[in-house]
């Protein structure tokens, strides 16, 4: 499914294609990966105007930058994963299953770990199952539950996709490793305040390990 931005008539603004991505609560519309090549930074320009009209613009500029960064990264990651027949959401599910002890997890737990709505989990697993990367089987610990289990083909695809993402540093090649750790820590505070998790002995508190 491809939607188009309004416009595109002769003399009007050019249309821009959008790529779908499986995300919680539905499908985000993600702009295709194409440099805008603007002669100025639109977020910085908006911040200047904001300062004149409303006051401190730092929160607005930070949020707007995060939202734009998400668009850029999702487009970049999906472009890297497209040759493997995956979106980033489906890749996350495959990796989660690979991380599990037996390569299988209850659907409910997949939703919790990926922090997505149950409907999104169903859609993701449906796609992976149709590709032969995941199978479903009854959960022996819960007569009404279902397990999603990664297949041998799913493990192979996940391994190849991971190699490509690692080579591209997940689209974050413009940052040093220490800067990535700092970014994780800063955004972790936002997630903590939103109630994503309860800090404790099992939760990392210093950010991801960094190879030097």
Regions flagged by a language model, labelled:
Residues 126-185:
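Charged, amphipathic alpha-helical coiled-coil/dimerization segments
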Residues 107, 125-126:
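Short, hydrophobic-biased segments on the C-terminal half of alpha helices
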Residues 1-7, 11-84:
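N-terminal leader segment of winged-helix/HTH proteins
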Residues 58, 62-77, 153, 164, ...:
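C-terminal ligand-sensing/allosteric alpha-helical core of TetR-family HTH transcriptional regulators
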């Amino acid at each position: 499914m491809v939607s188009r931005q309004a416009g595109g008539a002769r003399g009007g603004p050019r249309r821009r294609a959008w790529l779908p991505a499986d995300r919680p609560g539905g499908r985000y519309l993600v702009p295709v990966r194409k440099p805008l090549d603007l002669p100025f930074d639109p977020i910085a320009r908006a911040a200047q105007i904001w300062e004149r009209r409303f006051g401190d613009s730092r929160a607005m500029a930070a949020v707007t930058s995060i939202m734009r960064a998400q668009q850029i990264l999702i487009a970049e990651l999906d472009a890297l994963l497209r040759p493997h027949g995956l979106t980033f959401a489906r890749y996350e599910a495959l990796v989660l299953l690979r991380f599990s002890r037996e390569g299988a997890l209850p659907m409910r737990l997949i939703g919790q770990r990926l922090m997505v709505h149950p409907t999104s989990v169903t859609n993701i697993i449906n796609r992976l199952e149709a590709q032969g990367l995941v199978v479903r089987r009854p959960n022996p610990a819960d007569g009404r539950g279902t397990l999603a289990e990664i297949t041998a083909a799913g493990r192979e695809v996940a391994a190849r996709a991971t190699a490509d993402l690692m080579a591209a540093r997940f689209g974050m090649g413009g940052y040093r490793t220490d800067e990535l750790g700092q970014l994780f820590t800063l955004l972790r505070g936002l997630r903590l305040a939103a109630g994503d998790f309860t800090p404790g002995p099992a939760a990392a508190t210093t950010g991801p390990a960094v190879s030097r």
